[in-house]
């Protein structure tokens, strides 16, 4: 064995004795944590960016097949059903067979892992979420890629700690949180929102310290640099740039926030109802689960042909709405329709998130509210698009209960920095109203539901064995 081979072997195999382990063991040297946080950010950025590219590729390929090859062999409606059903089947099968924790958004799983009550099987979650998400999102279901990107980012953070054999619990925790921040930063091209999401939304689980906050910041920045290097530096959503509204119009934003606060509480409860309904339908039986998911995929494949506005994550719909392409009545119908399709898709347990669908809902209702206000108050100088942007932040704030994150997220996604004041008013109004109504943050609600169901399953196992 040559000297070079001996060195490589010592690095890869005898990790406790190598230079990397010594580097990490210097009394929790901050530079070591920050170095690993940067690595986590780069990897989370790569995973998140290429996940977006992969989902877009699947969607475009599906469309091309319908236009050319399969569309000529079969009736168009049948081809659309079969393609989307097959894509959905892949997503549901991978989740149920290899990583049930990859169902849904995945953010509650990361929060549970930060509390040491949920495992992070990164070697399963990352591939299942990546390829399963490609299938589910590519089929046209109303799901977002942002939640999966956060879960994969957190899994990348745990992967790095395992590969480098990091033993310190605080460091492992910091890198898990750093991965989640990097995932969100890469998903939305929003580094500030990625940082604040961990600090604000995950505040019950996040261990605040100077080192952990620095690690989160570095990871989010590195992930965003990777995203911009691959996808460019444009905002995720292209829309008009608005000037700040006049002060006498700000009360309308507060009213809009109150409406979203009430709806946010109702929406969170309906999510749980939808999940329970699907569990009662398939009873965690794999065959029933796959049949349910495959049928849903086929239905949304058909909707893609005739009512595409009711399909997909909804990011593509936001510019059309803010450009004034829909009447108020049509916006209300689309809002109601997308509420139903969002609940169906997310409640079914498909590997996809709810971030993007919620932003689309906020846009639809917000623009309808603004257009109605402009008709009723013609002397007030307002633009309906302002309320669409405010609605995005308000619904996020009401459901996730993270107003600062929602404000930063919308500003970074749309580049509408002049609307920060109406965004603050709308988001805070939504949060306060949601608290008065007694609602709970959606991800905490989903985590508690997961833990409760796991306990019930564990209690049922001895009874089944005894019987």
From Swiss-Prot:
CDD domains per the UniProt record, alphabetical: EriC (cd01031)
Statement: the UniProt record of this protein carries the keyword Cell membrane: yes
Bilayer topology: Multi-pass membrane protein
Reaction(s) catalysed by this chain's protein: 2 chloride(in) + H(+)(out) = 2 chloride(out) + H(+)(in)
Annotated site residue numbers, Mediates proton transfer from the protein to the inner aqueous phase: 201
Site (Mediates proton transfer from the outer aqueous phase to the interior of the protein): 146
Subunit relationships: Homodimer.
Name of this chain's protein: H(+)/Cl(-) exchange transporter ClcA
Species in which this protein is naturally found: Vibrio vulnificus (strain YJ016)
């Amino acid at each position: 064995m040559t000297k070079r081979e001996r060195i490589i072997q010592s690095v890869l195999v005898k990790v406790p004795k190598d230079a990397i382990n010594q580097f990490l063991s210097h009394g929790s040297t901050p530079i070591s944590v920050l170095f690993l946080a940067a690595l986590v950010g780069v990897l989370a950025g790569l995973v998140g960016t290429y996940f977006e590219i992969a989902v877009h590729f699947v969607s475009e390929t599906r469309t091309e097949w319908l236009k050319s090859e399969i569309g000529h062999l079969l009736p168009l409606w049948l081809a659309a059903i079969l393609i989307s059903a097959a894509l959905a089947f892949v997503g549901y099968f991978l989740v149920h067979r290899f990583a049930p924790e990859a169902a849904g958004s995945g953010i509650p799983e990361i929060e549970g892992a930060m509390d040491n009550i949920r495992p992070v099987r990164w070697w399963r979650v990352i591939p299942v979420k990546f390829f399963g998400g490609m299938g589910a999102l590519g089929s046209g279901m109303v799901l977002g890629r942002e939640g999966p990107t956060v879960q994969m980012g957190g899994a990348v953070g745990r992967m790095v700690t395992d590969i480098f054999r990091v033993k310190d619990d605080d460091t492992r925790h910091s890198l898990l949180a750093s991965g989640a921040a990097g995932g969100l930063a890469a998903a939305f091209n929003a580094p500030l929102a990625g940082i604040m999401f961990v600090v604000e939304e995950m505040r019950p689980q996040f261990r605040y310290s100077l080192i952990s906050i620095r690690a989160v910041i570095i990871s989010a920045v590195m992930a965003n640099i990777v995203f911009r290097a691959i996808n460019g530096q444009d905002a995720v959503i292209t829309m008009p740039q608005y000037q700040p509204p006049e002060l006498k119009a700000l009360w309308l934003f507060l009213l809009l926030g109150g409406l979203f606060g009430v709806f946010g509480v109702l929406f969170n409860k309906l999510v749980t109802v939808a999940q329970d309904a699907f569990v009662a339908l398939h009873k965690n039986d794999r065959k029933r689960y796959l049949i349910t998911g495959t049928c849903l995929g086929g239905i949304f494949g058909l909707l893609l042909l005739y009512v595409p506005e009711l399909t997909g994550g909804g990011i593509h719909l936001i510019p059309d709405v803010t450009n004034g392409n829909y009447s108020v009545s049509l916006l209300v119908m689309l809002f109601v329709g997308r509420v139903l399709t969002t609940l169906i898709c997310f409640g079914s347990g498909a590997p996809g998130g709810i971030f993007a669908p919620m932003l689309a809902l906020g846009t639809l209702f917000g623009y309808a509210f603004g257009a109605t206000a402009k008709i009723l108050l013609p002397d007030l100088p307002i633009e309906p698009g302002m309320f669409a942007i405010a609605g995005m932040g308000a619904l996020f704030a009401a459901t996730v209960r993270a107003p600062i994150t929602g404000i930063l997220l919308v500003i970074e996604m749309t580049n509408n920095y002049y609307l920060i004041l109406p965004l603050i008013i709308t988001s805070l109004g939504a949060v306060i109203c949601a608290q008065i109504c007694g609602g709970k943050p959606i991800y905490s609600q989903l985590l508690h539901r997961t833990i409760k169901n796991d306990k019930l399953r564990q209690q049922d196992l001895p009874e089944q064995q005894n019987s």
